[in-house]
């Protein structure tokens, strides 16, 4: 969707507004569908967003993203090496590392752009539930083609031919069936 007019701003619950510009980018953590893991250790990949992160903070973020299960099985743990674009990891594991990195960044708004597409349905739901529990007063925006996540969302919007529509609870439940 490419806008041809208008402005974009964020409104806080207290009514204050922030204009969207280069400075407001720090308010976002973004996880794309594609693989964003770099060569190095898991800890080095995580510290790309917070150089001062402790091992404990990294492990907590990995747990939120359901990545600690496979990281902890490696004798090197968070010091395990991964190749460029996550070589040595499955796509689902690489996606969970990217999500953990975004969680560690702890920005007020988390954007997950098809970021769980390589995960099975159960893991995807667990990751999203963990994010919701860990970030109760923050915003998480999920773009998806999978209906399974819609029931976890407070608000559901559908984009069709450039038009954005908010679905009410009944429409949202029906859209799960229509996918």
List where the protein language model places each region:
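Conserved post-Walker A segment of ABC ATPase nucleotide-binding domains
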Residues: 1-63, 126, 132-137
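ABC-fold ATPase nucleotide-binding domain signature/coupling loops
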Residues: 11-18, 68-97, 169-170, 176-179
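Hydrophobic anchor residue at the start of the ABC signature
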Residues: 93, 99, 127, 143
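A short, proline-enriched helix->beta-strand linker immediately N-terminal to the Walker B motif
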Residues: 104-108, 137
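Catalytic Walker B motif of ABC-type/P-loop ATPase nucleotide-binding domains
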Residues: 110-114
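Helix N-cap at the start of a conserved alpha-helix in ABC-type nucleotide-binding domains
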Residues: 121-122
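Conserved H-loop
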Residues: 137-144
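H-loop (His-switch) and adjacent beta-strand-loop-beta switch element
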Residues: 153-169
């Amino acid at each position: 969707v490419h806008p041809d007019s208008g402005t974009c701003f964020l409104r806080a619950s207290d009514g204050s507004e922030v204009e969207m510009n280069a400075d407001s980018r720090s308010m976002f953590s973004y996880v794309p569908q594609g693989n964003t893991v770099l060569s190095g250790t898991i800890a080095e990949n995580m510290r790309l967003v917070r150089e001062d992160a402790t091992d404990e903070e990294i492990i907590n973020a990995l747990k939120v993203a359901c990545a600690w299960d496979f990281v902890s099985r490696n004798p090197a743990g968070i010091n395990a090496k991964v190749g460029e674009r996550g070589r040595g990891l499955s796509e689902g594991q690489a996606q969970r590392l990217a999500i953990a990195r975004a969680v560690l960044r702890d920005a007020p708004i988390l954007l997950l752009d098809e970021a769980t597409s390589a995960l099975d349905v159960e893991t995807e739901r667990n990751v999203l539930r963990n994010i919701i529990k860990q970030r109760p007063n923050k915003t998480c925006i999920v773009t998806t083609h999978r209906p399974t996540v819609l029931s976890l969302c407070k608000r559901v919007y559908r984009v069709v031919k450039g038009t954005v529509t908010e679905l009410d609870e009944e429409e949202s439940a029906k859209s799960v069936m229509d996918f």
